[in-house]
Structures are given as structure tokens and as C-alpha cells.
Amino acid sequence: MAGEWACLLVSLVLLWGAAGSRDGFLLDRNFCRIKCSFLGSNSMCADRCTVLGASAGHCNNYACFCTDLRDRVKIWGDSVRCRKP
């Protein structure tokens, strides 16, 4: 019985860890990608991603892209550049 509970607990932790983070572009309030267009944008993007709990961040296609973001952060993962609310 204890072995079954331990196995179940490990499975839940692994599933939570896999579902708890993802990669994507940061969005502003209008669901537009946060732009990287100024000198120093790459380091600002990396800093912003780190503050949000991501493992890394960099400018990609002129937008701020974070890796291993938490689910609570709103991101957009495909090629759409801006969506109106």
C-alpha cells in the first residue's frame, strides 16, 4: 500500500512539473507580443523573463521569448503577432 502511494505521488509530481512550464512570447494587455526593438532589448527581455520565473529569455523575431515560463504568465506560442481583445 505504501509503495502504491509513493508511486502515485511521484507520478503526480512529474506530471505537475511537465505541465507547469512552457515556452512562448510575452504578451502585453492587448495580446500583442512585447517588442524587442531597442539597443539592450535582449538583456531587458532576459531580465523580464527571469523575474517572471523563466529559466531564460531572449529576443526572437523582434519579440521577447521566454523558456520554461510558469502557466500563470500569459504567452503566445505561435506566429500570430498581435490579437485584438
Curated annotation (Swiss-Prot):
SUPFAM superfamilies: Scorpion toxin-like. Residues 22-83 form the LCN-type CS-alpha/beta domain. Its main location: secreted. It comes from the Eukaryota. Gene3D superfamilies: Knottin, scorpion toxin-like. It is found in: Secreted. Disulfide bonds join 32-82, 36-59, 45-64, 49-66. Keywords: Disulfide bond, Ion channel impairing toxin, Neurotoxin, Secreted, Signal, Toxin, Voltage-gated sodium channel impairing toxin. The keyword Secreted applies. GO terms for molecular function: sodium channel inhibitor activity; toxin activity. Putative sodium channel toxin. This is Putative sodium channel toxin Ts37. The lineage of its organism: Eukaryota, Metazoa, Ecdysozoa, Arthropoda, Chelicerata.
